[in-house]
């Protein structure tokens, strides 16, 4: 639970290949599920499993591939090795940008990619489509996580959903009254909590501002907070510049945010459920809510390297990691909702899935999951260009000053 220690200020690099990839997609209702707006390289998924190759190189967020080294009681790698004969080498990474760069080396077979990295990996040809029929446990993954813009392109799956969560509005109950249910407490320039706001430190946070504007300035026409044309992007950036005097701290490590909430340096902010749980467990009076405007969030996907020399082991790993028992172990240790619907029966804390809204499709619908912004608008528009992540990164530098 205490292992999403992510220094994610530089979630994506400026060298975004997506802007140059293919043609723009259609916004019609007949458009296939998944991402639109670019054409990935033509790569074929694995046709059938062979003999396990005896090795597997795993690139993972800390806490996703535990072998007992950090905690002897937390180990789902060794059972996999014993079951398959695939010797696992784990390389943890700290940011999505780091993961993307490491995947380019071809040294890794599988990667746990967040939505802000997955499309880059697809567009560059560093990962290939996944034959989900070779992953039996895929059948039990929640339907609302399948064939989404961050893990599929034109109805072709590029990975196996693993876990997910929302970026929640969080506050100290002894300092913030009445209980807020809107992001306005963080964005309104007249907020009574000036100098006490905690905001996420990443260019992807521009999407949070866009989501707020989508509801509060509908005349901007924002349909997707990751698909912003010039006017929409300027409005989101201006809102974040207006917010800057309200902010006490920009956080990229949830432990530091928890500390700020505990000591009162910050009284309201955006946080993960694991942050709320930890802060509460250490005595601070905090609560959280998914606001009326909705929220941004993440859904992580296991993807297979196009250069992998151990593809049978890779597929066996994906099936293992989303099996009910293991998916439950990872979700509890990492601090997120599991992707496998049957995992909830396997959690040690029987309230875990309720706390994290694991099977709550309506809750999930309110989340705008991290996705890589590209020049071809992800909302299907073809008459304008949208701002790509390189421009988001430059704007974030200006916002923070």
Model-found features: residue ranges?
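A bilobed periplasmic-binding-protein/Venus flytrap-type ligand-binding module shared by bacterial periplasmic
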Residues: 168-175, 211-213, 298-311, 329-333
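C-terminal motif of bacterial Sec signal peptides marking the signal peptidase cleavage site
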Residues: 17-20
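Conserved C-terminal helix/tail region of periplasmic/extracytoplasmic solute-binding proteins
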Residues: 366-401
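Extracytoplasmic ligand-binding site segments that recognize negatively charged/polar headgroups
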Residues: 56-73, 107, 112-260
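Early extracytoplasmic/lumenal segment of secretory-pathway proteins
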Residues: 22, 36-120
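Periplasmic-binding protein-like
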Residues: 137-140, 237-243, 282-306
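A ligand-binding cleft/hinge motif common to bilobed small-molecule-binding domains
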Residues: 117-120, 270-285
């Amino acid at each position: 639970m205490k292992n999403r220690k992510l220094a994610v200020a530089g979630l994506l690099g400026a060298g975004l290949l997506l802007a140059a990839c293919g043609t723009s997609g259609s916004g019609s209702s007949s458009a296939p599920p998944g991402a639109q707006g670019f054409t990935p390289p033509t790569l074929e998924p694995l046709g059938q499993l062979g003999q396990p190759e005896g090795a597997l190189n795993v690139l993972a967020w800390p806490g996703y591939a535990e072998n007992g080294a950090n905690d002897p009681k937390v180990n789902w790698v060794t059972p996999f090795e014993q079951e398959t004969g695939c010797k696992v080498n784990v390389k943890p990474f700290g940011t999505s940008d780091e993961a993307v760069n490491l995947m380019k080396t071809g040294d890794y077979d599988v990667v746990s990619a967040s939505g802000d990295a997955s499309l880059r990996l697809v567009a560059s040809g560093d990962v290939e489509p996944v034959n989900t029929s070779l992953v039996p446990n895929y059948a039990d993954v929640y339907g609302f996580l399948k064939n989404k813009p961050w893990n599929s392109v034109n109805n072709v799956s590029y990975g196996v959903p693993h876990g997910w969560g929302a970026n929640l509005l969080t506050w100290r109950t002894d300092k913030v009254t009445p209980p807020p249910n809107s992001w306005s407490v963080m964005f309104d320039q007249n907020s009574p909590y000036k100098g006490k706001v905690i905001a996420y430190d990443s260019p992807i946070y521009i999407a949070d501002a866009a989501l707020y504007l989508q509801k509060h300035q509908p005349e901007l026409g924002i349909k997707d907070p990751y698909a912003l044309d010039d006017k929409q992007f300027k409005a989101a950036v201006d809102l974040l510049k207006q917010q800057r005097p309200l902010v006490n701290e920009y956080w990229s490590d949830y432990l530091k945010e928890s500390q700020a909430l505990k000591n009162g340096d910050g009284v309201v902010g955006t946080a993960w459920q694991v942050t709320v749980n930890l802060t509460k467990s250490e005595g601070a009076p905090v609560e959280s809510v998914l606001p009326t405007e909705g929220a941004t969030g993440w859904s992580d996907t296991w993807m297979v390297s196009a250069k992998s020399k151990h593809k049978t082991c890779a597929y066996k790993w994906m099936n293992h990691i989303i099996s009910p028992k293991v998916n439950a172990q990872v979700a509890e240790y990492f601090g997120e909702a599991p992707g496998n619907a049957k995992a909830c029966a396997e959690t040690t804390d029987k309230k875990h899935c309720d706390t994290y809204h694991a099977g709550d499709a309506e809750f999930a619908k309110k989340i705008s999951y991290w996705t890589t912004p590209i020049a071809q608008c992800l909302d299907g528009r073809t008459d304008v260009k949208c701002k790509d992540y390189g421009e988001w990164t430059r704007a974030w530098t200006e916002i923070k000053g």
